[in-house]
């Protein structure tokens, strides 16, 4: 079977987002998971920023991974992927000029689409990690991303967090990112379908929702009807891999019992040691959360 080119995959992603259906992402974090996802029939995969941080650094999602490290992992995936892969490019690794560099590097890596979010990252001195940049700066980042793109088939999605801002502000941000030329809008923190209807009013570009498995948003037909073309439930496959690795190694060391009682979430917390980073942020950055 002939191998699809990066541009073929980008066209496939655009065909998905131009359809009337809602597609669910596979969490892909290395070349093997990308091949498995394609073989199982997933239409699209996503390389999460949080997962890349875990895979490359064994570190929590505190914007610690560098652009180079993220691109290296994306390149490994892009080398073998036979499904479109979305890159969660966080804040674009800096200001609008950094965003341009991010787009150039991820396009070369073979990514089909990427998201640029308006969270203030990395965490700033004395500021909450959930603070957002201004809408004007967010618009500038999207315009810069579009300027840097060489292959017009690659999709640029603007991302915002509806859970931490008033509805009217979320509506304004979404509409301004659309007006800036974003190929789509990614929204995190939608509570239910009424919330989605409010925020997506007037949006004509494709929507991507990050739901983390919210049971209030499980009606796929309704998601599709409301313009959602991509739904990200989270990264269960990656956390299942952590759990399986732990249990296998534990058994090899002949610790009594084939399986531990620790969940994947508990294992991730144990081995990424987030409390250290929280303490360092409090100690050196005056961040108390």
Swiss-Prot record:
It comes from the Bacteria. Its cofactor is Mg(2+). One of its GO terms (biological process) is oxaloacetate metabolic process. Its EC number is 4.1.1.112. The keyword Metal-binding applies. It is an enzyme of class 4 (lyase). Homotetramer; dimer of dimers. Belongs to the isocitrate lyase/PEP mutase superfamily. Oxaloacetate decarboxylase family. This is Oxaloacetate decarboxylase.
């Amino acid at each position: 079977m002939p191998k699809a080119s990066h541009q073929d995959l980008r066209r496939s992603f655009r065909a998905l987002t131009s359809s009337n259906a809602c597609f669910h992402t596979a969490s892909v974090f290395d070349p093997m998971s990308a091949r498995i996802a394609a073989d199982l029939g997933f239409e699209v995969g996503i390389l999460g920023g949080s997962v890349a941080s875990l895979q490359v650094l064994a570190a929590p999602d505190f914007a610690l991974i560098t652009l180079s490290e993220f691109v290296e992992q994306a390149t490994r995936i892009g080398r073998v992927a036979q499904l479109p892969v979305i890159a969660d490019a966080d804040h674009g690794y800096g200001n609008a000029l950094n965003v341009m560099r991010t787009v150039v590097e991820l396009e070369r890596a073979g990514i089909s689409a990427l998201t640029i979010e308006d969270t203030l990252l990395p965490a700033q001195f004395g500021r909450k990690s959930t603070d957002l940049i201004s809408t004007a700066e967010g618009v500038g980042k999207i315009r810069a991303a579009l300027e840097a793109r060489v292959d017009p088939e690659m999709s640029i999605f603007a991302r915002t967090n509806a859970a931490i801002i008033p509805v009217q502000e979320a509506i304004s941000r979404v509409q301004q990112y659309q007006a800036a030329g974003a190929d789509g809008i990614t929204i995190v923190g939608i509570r239910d379908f009424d919330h989605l209807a409010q925020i997506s009013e007037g949006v004509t570009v494709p929507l991507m929702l990050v739901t983390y498995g919210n049971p209030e948003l499980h009606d796929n037909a309704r998601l599709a009807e409301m313009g959602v073309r991509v739904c990200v439930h989270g990264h269960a496959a990656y956390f299942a891999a952590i759990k399986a690795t732990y249990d296998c190694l534990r058994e090899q060391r002949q610790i009594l019992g084939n399986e531990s009682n620790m969940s994947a979430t508990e294992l991730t917390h144990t081995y990424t040691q987030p409390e250290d980073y929280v303490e360092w942020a409090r100690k050196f950055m005056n961040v108390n959360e």
